[in-house]
From Swiss-Prot:
One of the record's GO cellular component terms: plasma membrane
Protein's recorded name: Monocarboxylate transporter 9
Keyword terms, alphabetized: Cell membrane, Membrane, Transmembrane, Transmembrane helix
Entries under InterPro entries matching the protein: MCT9, MFS, MFS_dom, MFS_trans_sf, Proton-linked_MCT
Regions crossing the membrane: 13-33, 53-73, 80-100, 102-122, 137-157, 164-184, 303-323, 341-361, 370-390, 396-416, 431-451, 460-480
Localization terms from the record: Cell membrane
The species this protein was found in: Rattus norvegicus (Rat)
Reaction equations catalysed: creatine(in) = creatine(out); (R)-carnitine(in) = (R)-carnitine(out)
Family according to the record: Belongs to the major facilitator superfamily. Monocarboxylate porter (TC 2.A.1.13) family.
CDD domains (UniProt xref): MFS_MCT9
Length: 508
């Protein structure tokens, strides 16, 4: 059952506004968790690697659970999922204020808040796409900046709340603010279906029998059977209440014996239903095999395989600065009075700018989005390697701005995926890539923290991060170079291109 045509405006702009504030409220604290990270280090006295798991889980769980989030939104709709997820995020933040140890935060802040954010992201993107068609890119760009603006504001807000109310009070207030997501969700009016104004149950006779395993003649015979044909008689009586415990003997005459036999039509129906279940299970298994086959075919595309490696390495190396920059400044002995603007705030506002500008740049026909994405990866890797050389607030602020701007390449990642696999395989491929992006988000900060615990300095940690991102960028660059297209041209050409890779590599 399809939805009516996207209005490309009207109530859709209300959807854009509430989706913007939904992402602002849910992602503000998890993305600005670097401010809380420093406080948790002092409060619980755990290592940097272990403490970093809290923030990395909050960002990674939502991406790891993206298939489940999509299933919930498609089953229940954006409005119920948004309201439910608002309770999850608010409850997780408030529960974190009661955390007795770091392991409690793994659950309350990392898993509960992270899962709520993943559900909210899927819900806001889904309903925005339903309301917009020709202006979909603009609408998605506007709502995606909500998380970046939230990072910018929440970094300063959480620091101020900690000064006035302490860490526990800060988490309680931020959790209370997250309850405004419920109001945003209530305004997410779903589009009516194209064939009926309200959802109605379809009459059974109107449903096509796709899994029929017996012919119409047999069904008609079963439907026209009388009550007596099935082995029952009008003379049969129910036992009175007083006769329940009394033993009865079976009738010895042939007519009575017929009643004790299981009727043949009933046996036939049991066999038919058993076969039906077997056939349905076989179809489900075939769907699963087809899914695995499609996944395997995606990885036969060299560009997609390189993109998979690049996004994994990018998130392992590129995500830690958004979580750890505040502690990096403290470890480099930058004075508190010099931190006029939190480094996390600079990172956040430049991420919003990067999303908008890179998204606009990707719309130009003369720009190859694959090469643009590779350029952001390589420059990000170089900026990460430069962090150990920055020992002052000014240089750290400049690098935070550069890294934030380049992290805005998330806005062009769907373009890159589409160009790699085609629009027909976008949903499947994007889900796989987001899963591994979540894996990288979850692993990156703890790895950097472990390097610090091992060496007592962030220098080697950020050299490692920069190397990961550079490696991913160069692997993707080698996969899309035109020379691969020329190598393919020397081989015997089939009647039609069998992979999308040839098209991508030759499109310079």
């Amino acid at each position: 059952m399809g939805f009516q045509k996207s209005p490309d405006g009207g109530w859709g702009w209300v959807i854009v506004v509430v989706s913007f504030f939904t992402q602002f409220l849910c992602y503000g604290s998890p993305l600005a968790v670097g401010v809380l990270y420093v406080e948790w280090l002092d409060a619980f006295g755990e290592g940097k690697g272990k403490t970093a798991w809290v923030g990395s889980l909050a960002s990674g769980v939502g991406l790891l659970a993206s298939p489940v989030c999509s299933l919930f939104v498609s089953s229940f709709g954006a409005r119920p999922v948004t309201i439910f997820s608002g309770f999850l995020v608010a409850g997780g933040l408030m529960l974190s204020s009661l955390a007795p140890n770091i392991y409690f935060l793994f659950f309350s802040y990392g898993i509960v808040v992270g899962l709520g954010c993943g559900l909210l992201y899927t819900a806001t993107v889904t309903i925005t796409c339903q309301y917009f068609d020709s202006r979909r890119g603009l609408a998605l760009g506007l709502i995606s900046t909500g998380s970046s603006v939230g990072l910018f504001i929440y970094a300063a807000l959480q620091r101020m709340l900690i000064e006035f109310y302490g860490l526990d009070g800060c988490l309680l207030i931020v959790g209370a603010l997250a309850l405004n997501i419920l109001a945003c969700g209530s305004l997410m009016r779903p589009l009516q279906t194209s064939d009926c104004p309200f959802p109605e149950k379809i009459a059974p006779e109107n449903v096509p029998d796709r899994y029929s395993i017996y012919n119409e003649k047999e069904k008609n015979q079963e439907e026209t059977m009388t009550f007596q044909d099935k082995g029952y008689s009008n003379e049969d009586k129910c036992l009175p209440n007083g006769d329940w415990g009394r033993e009865t003997s079976l009738p010895k005459n042939p007519t009575g014996a017929a009643h004790t036999k299981e009727p043949e039509p009933y046996k036939k129906k049991v066999v038919e239903q058993t076969n039906f279940c077997k056939q349905l299970a076989k179809r489900k298994w075939q769907v699963y095999r087809n899914y695995c086959g499609e996944t395997a075919s995606l990885f036969k595309n060299k560009v997609f395989s390189a993109l998979f490696v690049a996004i994994l390495l990018f998130d392992i190396g590129g995500f830690p600065p958004s979580l750890l920059m505040e502690d990096v400044a403290r470890s480099y002995h930058v004075r508190e009075e010099d931190l006029t603007i939190p480094l996390i705030s600079i990172f956040g506002i430049m991420t919003a700018v990067g999303k908008l500008l890179l998204g606009i740049l990707a719309d130009f026909k003369w720009v190859n989005t694959l090469y643009l994405y590779v350029a952001t990866l390589i420059i990000t890797g170089l900026a990460l390697c430069a962090i150990p050389l920055a020992k002052s607030y000014v240089t750290l602020a400049i690098l935070s701005g550069i890294l934030g701007f380049l992290t805005g390449n998330w806005s062009i990642f769907p373009y890159v995926t589409t160009k790699t696999v085609g629009i027909d395989k976008l949903a499947h491929a994007y889900g796989i890539l987001m899963f591994f992006a979540g894996l990288g988000n979850s692993l990156g900060p703890p790895i950097v923290g472990w390097f610090y615990d091992w060496t007592q300095t962030y220098d080697i940690a950020f050299y490692f991060s920069g190397f990961c991102v550079l490696l991913g960028g160069f692997i993707l660059l080698l996969a899309i170079l035109p020379c691969w297209g020329m190598c393919n041209q020397r081989l015997p050409k089939p009647a039609a291109p069998t992979t999308f890779f040839y098209k991508v590599a030759s499109n310079v």
